[in-house]
Amino acid sequence: MGFSRSLNRTVGVFVFFILDIVDFLLCFTYKTLDFFFESEWKPCYCCPPPEAKPISAGGNRGGKMIVSERSGDYSKVVSLTRTKIYLDEISDTLYSRPSLLTKLTKLVKCFKKDVVKCCDESKKRSPSTKKTLLTVNSTVVEKLQRTPRWSDCHCTFCTSWLSSSNQSLFVNVQQPTDNKAQENVVFIHGFLSSSTFWTETLFPNFSDSAKSNYRFLAVDLLGYGKSPKPNDSLYTLKEHLEMIERSVISQFRLKTFHLVAHSLGCILALALAVKHPGAIKSLTLLAPPYYSVPKGVQGTQYVMRRLAPKEVWPPMAFGASVASWYEHISRTVSLVLCKNHHLLEFLTRLLTRNRMRTYLIEGFLCHTHNASWHTLHNIIFGSGSKVEAYLDHVRDNVDCEVAVFHGGRDELIPVECSYGVKRKVPRARIHVVPDKDHITIVVGRQKEFARELELIWRRSTTPQLHSIN
């Protein structure tokens, strides 16, 4: 066991050093391609913040601005066209992802430091080179950039939101034929997924009694499925929550509702429970990514290293590491797979002779790289120090049943995360399903899971069973 782990780490050092170089080269490749297709150099997060050139957005329509904020030993610098952002919602993992290559380049930078410093001081004395810096701590998003990037999919499915003036999330609704549902259930999918994760598995398998009493609402998160995919969005927690509140809670006038969430969706579900404590009737979490952050450790970096440990085995950990650490390699994967998802669906049907349903491919590939990259860092990693506070609030202030399901063979999010939820919320019921992983916790056992959900919803009508400790 010790030898295999050492071998895994040793091979990982070599493999990820090669990937560091590849990502570095792809950075220049995409800058060139972006300029060729869009007549503009697009900024990326591997660019050193001190070299950014901030300008004022001014009053020009569509003008760009650079937002800068000092945080510790580095600056957060964001180039955007949005009129509304939240710097406190931006994860430092976007800017600080140290690699062997960056450590080597720091040696060169240290050598040039004195020369550069002298040049900078001389420039500061010259009025003509004075920079206008716009520092923003908290603002709000008001417009969506509606033009998809050249590297994103332009098919009718992925761009259907562009033809609508209503910039709301897509919500798949199933309700009783008489439109007289007694209760509401909101489903929130996970990372690289969509509402089809629920509609193709659970919705057809609910009992007739449940279908006649509950209104089911499965939402496509911002940047996924049929929902808007603004390429200038930073996909922060506040943006996601505001869109869910506007598109689901306000749109359907939900006063009370049950919440069912998977993986990434668990973070959003907990945040919703904190904002609407009196509206939650039950809270069901599947594979919640909760990591208890040790004291004195930066939460964002800790969660990133737990989820993406830079190891080549198992394959799930390797894939998560590549997606998390390499902005340009992950964009290449998106360019090859997401932009050609219709071809992949066709080939899958052809090779399996239509014996395999392709809804998982739709959920996995119908997003933009900008959406997946920012959601991963700003929600999953950026919430490292927030989930614990959310759980404390749910324990003390949200009077509802809490149920947690986890696959015993989940290689992406370990089952220890669910036990951590139990320690924070003692009344939570933990269900570890043997021989199931991150996806098969639902897919393949949808009938059984549908019955389990119905039992939770029925039980939630008895308050004394889940009174707050």
From Swiss-Prot:
GO cellular component: extracellular region; plant-type cell wall; plasma membrane
InterPro entries named in the record: AB_hydrolase_1, AB_hydrolase_fold
Gene: BDG1
Summary of the function given for this chain in its UniProt record: Controls cuticle development and morphogenesis, by promoting cutin and suberin monomers loading. Involved in the regulation of abscissic acid (ABA) biosynthesis in response to osmotic stress. Plays an important role in osmotic stress and drought resistance. Required to ensure a reduced permeability of aerial tissue, thus preventing transpiration. Regulates lateral root hair development. Required for infection by the pathogenic necrotrophic fungus Botrytis cinerea, probably by regulating structural traits of the cuticle.
UniProt tissue specificity: Expressed exclusively in protodermal and epidermal cells of all organs, especially on adaxial sides.
Enzyme class: hydrolase
Induction: Induced by osmotic stress and abscissic acid (ABA).
Leader sequence segment: 1-45
Keywords assigned: Abscisic acid biosynthesis, Cell membrane, Cell wall, Cell wall biogenesis/degradation, Hydrolase, Lipoprotein, Membrane, Palmitate, Plant defense, Secreted, Signal
Name of the featured protein: Probable lysophospholipase BODYGUARD 1
Annotated catalytic residues: 189, 263, 410, 438
Membrane topology of this protein: Lipid-anchor
Any one GO MF annotation of this record: hydrolase activity
Enzyme Commission (EC) number: 3.1.1.-
Lipidation (N-palmitoyl cysteine): 46
Domain spans labelled AB hydrolase-1: 185-439
UniProt keyword annotation of Oxidoreductase present: no
Organism: Arabidopsis thaliana (Mouse-ear cress)
Localization of this protein: Cell membrane; Secreted, Cell wall
Predominant location: membrane
GO biological process terms, semicolon-separated: abscisic acid biosynthetic process; cell wall organization; cuticle development; cutin biosynthetic process; defense response to fungus; lateral root development; positive regulation of cutin biosynthetic process; positive regulation of response to water deprivation
The keyword Transmembrane is assigned to this record: no
Gene deletion effect: Defects characteristic of the loss of cuticle structure associated with an enhanced accumulation of cell wall-bound lipids and epicuticular waxes. Reduced expression of abscissic acid (ABA) biosynthesis genes (e.g. NCED3) in response to osmotic stress (e.g. polyethylene glycol) leading to reduced levels of ABA and high sensitivity to osmotic stress and drought, especially during seed germination and early seedling development. Increased aerial tissue permeability to the toluidine blue (TB) dye. Enhanced transpiration. Strong decrease in total cutin monomer load in young leaves and flowers.
Pfam families named in the record: Abhydrolase_1 (PF00561)
